[in-house]
UniProtKB/Swiss-Prot annotation:
It comes from Brachylophosaurus canadensis. Belongs to the fibrillar collagen family. The modification 5-hydroxylysine is found at residue 33. This is Collagen alpha-1(I) chain. Residues 1-113 are annotated as: Disordered. Contains mostly 4-hydroxyproline. Proline residues at the third position of the tripeptide repeating unit (G-X-Y) are hydroxylated in some or all of the chains.
Length: 113
């Protein structure tokens, strides 16, 4: 005789086994910047620097006091003789003693005849 109608479909099968994990996705965008932390402690003191160059010369000092007087100098050479003095006044008149008698005079002239 003729072929019969198809039978009723069977029930669905069981789910298959879980597939393998997919590849890792790309990294996400960077997050926002965090808040700035507090300042750190002060570092240790640095080494002492080298000695600086000498300063400029000072201003000149005040003038000193005058020294004591020196010893007396040697005696100078003798000067030349001065001019002659003025003529003196006339002396007083002399008071001579009376001189001795003079010699006898010559003979007189002859007498008259």
């Amino acid at each position: 005789g003729a072929t019969g109608a198809p039978g009723i479909a069977g029930a669905p099968g069981f789910p298959g086994a879980r597939g393998p994990s997919g590849p890792q996705g790309p990294s996400g965008a960077p997050g926002p910047k965090g808040v700035q932390g507090p300042p750190g402690p002060q570092g240790p003191r640095g080494l002492t620097g080298p000695i600086g160059p000498p300063g400029p010369a000072g201003a000149p000092g005040d003038k000193g006091e005058a020294g004591p007087s020196g010893p007396p100098g040697p005696t100078g050479a003798r000067g030349s003789a001065g001019p002659p003095g003025a003529t003196g006044f006339p002396g007083a008149a002399g008071r001579g003693e009376t001189g001795p008698a003079g010699p006898a005079g010559p003979p007189g002239p002859a007498g008259a005849r």
